[in-house]
Swiss-Prot record:
Signal peptide: none
Keyword Transcription among UniProt keywords: yes
Entry GO CC: nucleus
Domain bZIP, residue spans: 282-345
Keyword Nucleus in record: yes
BP GO terms, sorted: defense response to Gram-negative bacterium; positive regulation of dauer entry; regulation of gene expression; regulation of transcription by RNA polymerase II
Induction, as annotated: Expression up-regulated in animals exposed to the Gram-negative bacterium P.aeruginosa PAO1 for two generations.
Classification via PANTHER family: CYCLIC AMP RESPONSE ELEMENT-BINDING PROTEIN A
One example GO MF annotation: cAMP response element binding
Annotated stretches, region: Basic motif: 284-304
Family from the record: Belongs to the bZIP family.
Organism: Caenorhabditis elegans
Spans annotated as Disordered: 46-104, 119-149
Record's protein name: CREB homolog crh-2
Gene assigned in the entry: crh-2
Amino acid sequence: MNSSSSRSSMSMPMPMDMPQMHMGMNNNCEMNQMMHPIPNFPMKWEPCTPPDEKPHPSMLFPPLSGIFNQSRHSSTGEDYHGSSSGSPSSSLSSPNEFKDEPLGLDVHFGNSLFNAPFSPSATSSHSPSSYGMMHGSHSMASHQLHQQQLSPLPSVAHFSHSHHLQHHVVQHPSQASLQMNMNQIFSGPSHQYASSSVPHTFLFKDSTIYEGMGGMGLAAAQQQLKARNKMHEMAIRQHLITDQNITANGDLVLSAEERRTLVQEGYSIPQKYPLTKSEEESLKIVRRKIKNKLSAQESRRKRKEYIDALEGRLHCFSEENKSLKKQVHQLEASNRDLQQKLHQYESKEKM
């Protein structure tokens, strides 16, 4: 009997004290939290829920009234860190805050984003620390992704509070870089704004091509003007035309070529100064024709000289070619003689 009672007492588990039971429950909860960590909510703390149970909708999505009725930070005494409301326009401050800044951008909103201390509390998204706001939104986004994987409900990320928070937080560094670039642009006193009158170096990749083309056109025009002046001087020197002095008075003396060309073209021959408008035009036309004739004669003469020079070079090259051919024939004949002598010597050595 005693042995049976002792055996039963050994087999029965000993009752645990209440503090030990609570300690075991706390350990189990801590193990669940370590295996299934739940990040901090930006709105409030919620109790730990097992992964097999569906969370309450208030844990996933905060009430809309709390989102839209949150008070904005005052611009006096603290930096601007962005509003946590759901309105897209809430990220902008009042016009009076930015009246001294270009484009309505705040210069100091990036300082709190990187210089503020990290706040791991649940209300870090509502604190003046933008880093805590960014951390809270990131943790809430990861928790919502985990809950969406467990829940059969479709995702409504466009209604979530973290979507607006991430939108504001992501926009701040780009706005800070934009503000820095704008400060660099507006700060330079010698900066010139781009307008429609932009030089060719900004319109084309390689402006040297177009500048080179302009230089070539200028050189061609200068060469043409030089040729005309040369023809005019040559015509005067050969007494083909006479200088036209409009302010002169008295008799007009024309060259024989001018008189002949005037008659040939059907114009009247002027006799005295001052000349009428028609007489001036007729003399200009006649003198231009004489210059063109002289220019054509010069071009034909130069062409004939060039052809004569080419013919002379051709004659010289042909004579040189003939002499080289004679030398080749002589060398071939001497080579044949040497080969015959070599064969004779080889035959004598064999004998």
